[in-house]
């Protein structure tokens, strides 16, 4: 099926926020006298903050979320950059009349901070954030909402992400899925969720789009 719409996760997929997120978790855990290994912190990267902190301590979750977000916003511009070839790839997709959207588990404010800082906001016709949905990824609602706003059809849509919940959300919404090999998650781990594609470089999407019209 030809691909006419591409939905992207943001953090870890288009922009590199990994160091910022790790630093924000470490800052928060230090404030609350909690100790987690790097491996454990890695697992916290991706799901909504409310889910992560509720699992740690429901009685302190709201305060920990506030601490995390304050640090994350304060340090944001010191850490965040776009991954290589992202700008040129998005520009080429736009030139090919591919509809582009963002589907993120972050709050709208911080999503826009990242998009504006890296100069890629102009490429996206819709942006779905944690604030916009009742059920975050891996529920299909965010992907379905993005498609509805773009007038897209599942059979012509691709969801691209760096985490299993991106892949599962896309699959539950009956769209094609692609996992990125530069994810902090092990590639074999992502393969276990059976995405349609594993991309080594964001530019690979150009080939996928071209092949879909062949």
Swiss-Prot record:
Catalytic activity line of the entry:
diphosphate + H2O = 2 phosphate + H(+)
A single Gene Ontology molecular function, please? inorganic diphosphate phosphatase activity
Q: What is its EC number?
A: 3.6.1.1
Q: Does the keyword Hydrolase apply?
A: yes
Alphabetical keyword list? Hydrolase, Magnesium
| Domain of life of the organism encoding this protein | Bacteria
One Gene Ontology biological process: DNA repair
Q: Give the active-site positions.
A: 9
Enzyme's top EC category: hydrolase
CDD domains of this UniProt entry?
Answer: HAD_PPase
Which cofactors is this protein said to need?
Answer: Mg(2+)
Q: Please provide one cellular component term from the Gene Ontology annotations of this protein.
A: cytosol
Question: What is the role of the protein in this entry?
Answer: Hydrolyzes pyrophosphate formed during P-Ser-HPr dephosphorylation by HPrK/P. Might play a role in controlling the intracellular pyrophosphate pool.
Which HAMAP family does the record match to this protein?
Answer: Pyrophosphat_PpaX (MF_01250)
The family line of this record is: Belongs to the HAD-like hydrolase superfamily. PpaX family.
This one is known as Pyrophosphatase PpaX
Question: What organism does the record attribute this protein to?
Answer: Oceanobacillus iheyensis (strain DSM 14371 / CIP 107618 / JCM 11309 / KCTC 3954 / HTE831)
Q: Which gene encodes it?
A: ppaX
């Amino acid at each position: 099926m030809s691909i006419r719409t591409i939905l992207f996760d943001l953090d870890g997929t288009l922009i590199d926020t990994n160091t910022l997120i790790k630093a924000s978790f470490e800052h928060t855990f230090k404030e609350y006298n909690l100790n987690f290994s790097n491996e454990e912190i890695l697992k916290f990267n991706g799901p909504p903050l409310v889910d992560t902190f509720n699992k740690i301590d429901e009685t302190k979750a709201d305060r920990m979320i506030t601490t995390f977000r304050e640090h994350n916003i304060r340090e944001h511009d010191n850490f965040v950059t776009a991954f290589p070839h992202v700008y040129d790839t998005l520009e080429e997709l736009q030139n090919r009349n591919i509809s582009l959207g963002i589907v993120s588990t972050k709050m709208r404010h911080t999503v826009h901070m990242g998009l504006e800082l890296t100069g890629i906001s102009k490429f996206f016709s819709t942006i779905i954030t944690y604030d916009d949905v009742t059920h975050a990824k891996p529920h299909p609602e965010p992907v379905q909402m993005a498609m509805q706003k773009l007038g897209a059809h599942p059979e012509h849509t691709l969801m691209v992400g760096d985490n299993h919940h991106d892949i599962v959300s896309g699959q539950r919404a009956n769209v094609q899925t692609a996992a990125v090999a530069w994810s902090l998650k092990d590639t074999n781990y992502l393969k276990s969720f059976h995405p349609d594609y594993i991309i080594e470089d964001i530019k690979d999407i150009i080939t996928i789009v071209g092949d879909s019209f062949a």
